Regions:
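Catalytic domains that recognize anionic headgroups
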Residues: 1-491
């Protein structure tokens, strides 16, 4: 058996053709879905990049492994304590180690560990390659040569795992200009109207309609050609959507190249392929554009398409974590699932073509805001401890995802019973997880004690000035009232 894991960064589930998207963004992934398993309701337990992949590789939620942020103490694995063995639990029981210790040849082509200082990602990979000499954001045409060379060298061997990380949908949108815009004549999704743009224009927060490039339009210099300075008109909104969707199509082209290579080597029938992501991306949801700042539907709902030789094609609608997909792959390969993992195998469900899944999921964000959410039935309950300077985010929010997938109508006040149900599920889950952890301290509390999420630290005083300069003084006043201790620390 062979396994190719194509890890496409920042790929939200509903922008795939096989998920019903109106643009032809993913013809190659769609082909895999038709012949494999399309999981329709997979969510990253922890977002964004570093927390998500750390949860995936360790098999543990961020509240247990300790990684919920992009900087500070909660951006490193939690110490195992005095009973740490010569070979740490994290190393011995990582997803890649499970294959490596079973005799598989394991390899990863990714700049992610270097970008985030996440050396633990490499635990269990015999070959951990940043062949692009990158720091994240490499285009597929920079990643593919190393992947194709590896497949030429190892592809016909048995029992290998190759992880290939593609960044193209991640902001900034840098698909080569000569690639053009396949979606120039395609309209925006129906849901994003001028009414929504106008509402978002008056909101606050990094990567908002007036600052889709950070806390200021020029925070990172001039935006690339595929991204506008702001969302001041529907033309600019379309440019943002197009830049993202072109990145998806460019990554999908790379998927096609890799599939063709497997065909050329004559190993397609004996190679499993998993296509998934670390997190999604918001395009107006909760006022955020072209980033991943909440524990919400847009950010946490990710695609998962699995082609496994001998497994019947099917659509699975169960509610799953990305950890469940990782665990299922290990089970399908006939390997032992580490006892401490939080993931749940779906092997029996896939064999019987039943959905399976969980009653509810807990979703966490600690790098741009401090939030945990509960996804159950048709509902998403969100609890916010740090708003990431999005002044309109309430402490409690509730959305009907079936009727309102883009989170436009907060029902928390009108549906107190459902909000209380979500709150109770979250409180019980938190207590259960901390009881199983190496430490009784919630890493989210560590983030708050350090002054808040990494990506917003140090920005508040200058951002309050910008809000006042751009006619949004009311949000500046709200943020001043909410964050007095942060202002005292940063001024």
């Amino acid at each position: 058996m062979r396994l190719l894991y194509i890890d496409i960064d920042t790929l939200r589930s509903d922008h795939l053709g096989c998920a019903g998207y109106h643009r032809n963004t993913t013809p190659n992934i769609d082909d895999l879905a038709r012949g494999g398993v399309q999981f329709q309701n997979v969510y990253a337990s922890d977002v964004p990049c570093l927390p998500s992949r750390t949860a995936f590789i360790t098999g543990m939620f961020g509240i247990r492994n300790g990684v919920v942020n992009h900087g500070g103490l909660a951006a490193d694995l939690r110490p195992e304590g005095a009973d740490r063995n010569f070979f740490s639990r994290f190393s011995a029981r990582s997803w890649a180690s499970t294959f490596f210790l079973s005799g598989w040849h394991t390899a990863s082509i990714s700049s992610f560990p270097f970008r985030h200082g996440a050396s633990w990602w490499n635990s269990g990979f015999m070959e951990a390659m940043n062949l692009m000499r990158g720091f994240g954001g490499e285009r597929s045409d920079e990643v593919l040569p190393g992947a194709l060379e590896w497949l030429d060298r190892r592809g016909k061997d048995d029992n290998w795992l190759l992880h290939v990380h593609l960044w193209d949908p991640h902001t900034p949108y840098t698909t080569p200009e000569e690639y053009g815009n396949p979606f120039a004549d395609d309209p925006l999704p129906d849901w994003h109207t001028e009414e929504i743009r106008l509402k978002n224009w008056g909101l606050s927060g990094p990567h908002s309609a007036q600052e889709p490039w950070g806390f200021r339009p020029d925070e990172w210099g001039d935006p690339p050609p595929r991204q506008p300075w702001d969302a001041s008109s529907m033309e600019e909104v379309k440019q943002i959507f197009d830049g993202y969707d072109v990145g998806i199509r460019y990554a999908d082209d790379a998927v096609g190249v890799l599939m063709n290579k497997l065909d050329d080597l004559g190993v397609s029938d004996e190679t499993a392929v998993l296509v998934s992501s670390d997190h999604g991306e918001a395009f107006g949801e909760l006022g955020v554009y072209a980033d991943h700042q909440a524990a919400d539907e847009a950010t946490c709902h990710i695609p998962a398409v699995l082609h496994w030789p001998g497994l019947d094609s099917q659509v699975n609608k169960g509610l799953h974590y990305h950890l469940d997909i990782a665990t299922t792959v290990v089970d399908l390969a006939g390997l032992r699932i580490p006892q401490h993992w939080d993931g749940m195998s779906l092997l029996k469900n896939l064999e019987s073509q039943s959905d399976g899944g969980r009653d509810h999921l807990i979703l966490s964000q600690g790098a741009w805001s401090c939030q945990r959410s509960v996804r159950w039935q048709d509902h998403l309950y969100m609890r916010t401890w740090h708003d990431g300077y999005h002044g309109h985010w309430e402490e409690e929010m509730l959305f009907n995802i079936a009727k309102d997938p883009h989170e436009q109508n907060n029902l928390a006040i009108n549906e107190p019973r459902l909000a209380n149900e979500g709150s109770t599920i979250l409180q019980n889950w938190t207590s259960e997880q901390l009881a199983k952890s190496y430490s009784p301290v919630d890493p989210m509390e560590v983030v708050l004690d350090e002054g808040g999420p990494f990506h917003v630290r140090g920005h508040l005083p200058a951002y309050l000035d910008r809000l006042r300069e751009t006619g949004r003084s009311h949000w500046a006043e709200i943020l001043e009232d909410r964050h007095p201790s942060v202002l005292k620390l940063e001024e």
